[in-house]
Curated annotation (Swiss-Prot):
Pathway(s) the chain acts in: Pyrimidine metabolism; UMP biosynthesis via de novo pathway; UMP from orotate: step 2/2
NCBIfam families: PRK00230.1, pyrF
Protein name: Orotidine 5'-phosphate decarboxylase
Subunit organization: Homodimer.
Binding site for substrate: 8, 30, 59-68, 118, 178, 187, 207-208
Active site (catalytic residues): 61 (proton donor)
GO biological process terms held by the UniProt record: 'de novo' pyrimidine nucleobase biosynthetic process; 'de novo' UMP biosynthetic process
Length: 227
C-alpha cells in the first residue's frame, strides 16, 4: 500500500514547505483542483525539484464529453504526472476513447476512476444515483475495468468488494483516511490506514491529519509503517 499526501494548503509556499519536511520519504504528492488552478503546471516542476523521487498524482477528476476528456487527459500526460483521476460517471465510451489516446503514448499515467466521493453519505448517494452506494460503486468499477482504466477511487468500505469482483490487479485508491475516525470534517466514509490495508487498498490519501500536525514528518512515518 502506498501513501499519497494531499497538498491542499492555502498557499503554494505552505505546500512546498510541507514537502521539504517530507523529503526523502517514499510517497506520492497529490495535487488537486485548488493547487493546480492556483499554481499551474510549474508547481509540478517545483515538487520535482524538492525530491525527484516523489511521484505526482494529479487529482483533477476529469468529467466531460468523450473527446474533451481525452484531449485533457493527453495534456495531463504531457506533464509527466504518474497518476490522474477521471469520473467513472462520464461513461464507458468516454473512458474507452481516453484510454485509446493514452495507450498510444510511450509512457502514460495510471488512470483512476472516481466511483463515489467519500463525502457522500448512503442517503445522499441514493438520492443522486437511485442505487445503493456499494452496488453502484462495483457496477461503475466493472465498467471502468472494461474501458481499460487501471483502478478506481473509492472508500475503504468498497475496496474489498471491488477487489473480490474484479481481481487484486485492479487498483483501489482510498481517500478519507484519518488517524482518529471521529475526525470526519467534510468526509462521511472514513477509516484508518490499518483498515485500508485490511481491505486491500493499493493507495491511501491523507491530507489534514498530516499538514495540521505539529510534526508532519512523524505522522507520515507512522502512516508508512501501516502501509
Amino acid at each position: 500500500m502506498q501513501l499519497c499526501v494531499a497538498l491542499d494548503l492555502e498557499k503554494k509556499e505552505d505546500n512546498l514547505s510541507l514537502l521539504q519536511e517530507l523529503k526523502g520519504l517514499d510517497l506520492w504528492a497529490k495535487v488537486g483542483l485548488r493547487s493546480f488552478i492556483r499554481d499551474g503546471a510549474v508547481f509540478l516542476d517545483e515538487i520535482r525539484k524538492i525530491d525527484g523521487n516523489f511521484k505526482i498524482f494529479l487529482d483533477l477528476k476529469l468529467y466531460d464529453i468523450p473527446y474533451t476528456m481525452a484531449n485533457a487527459a493527453l495534456e495531463c500526460a504531457k506533464l509527466e504526472v504518474d497518476m490522474l483521476t477521471v469520473h467513472l460517471s462520464s461513461a464507458k465510451s468516454a473512458l474507452t476513447i481516453l484510454m485509446q489516446r493514452l495507450n498510444a503514448l510511450k509512457k502514460r499515467p495510471l488512470i483512476m476512476g472516481v466511483s463515489a466521493l467519500t463525502s457522500f453519505s448512503e442517503e445522499e448517494f441514493l438520492s443522486v444515483y437511485n442505487a445503493p452506494l456499494k452496488t453502484q460503486a462495483i457496477k461503475l468499477s466493472v465498467m471502468g475495468k472494461e474501458s481499460g482504466i487501471d483502478g478506481v477511487v473509492c472508500s475503504v468500505f468498497e475496496s474489498l468488494a471491488i477487489k473480490e469482483a474484479l481481481g487484486k490487479d485492479f487498483l483501489t485508491l482510498t481517500p478519507g483516511i484519518r488517524l482518529n475516525k471521529n475526525d470526519k470534517e467534510d468526509q462521511e466514509r472514513v477509516a484508518n490506514a490499518k483498515e485500508a490495508k485490511q481491505n486491500l487498498s493499493d493507495f491511501i490519501v491523507v491530507g489534514r491529519p498530516i499538514y495540521q500536525a505539529k510534526e508532519p514528518r512523524e505522522v507520515v512515518l507512522e502512516l508508512l509503517k501501516d502501509c
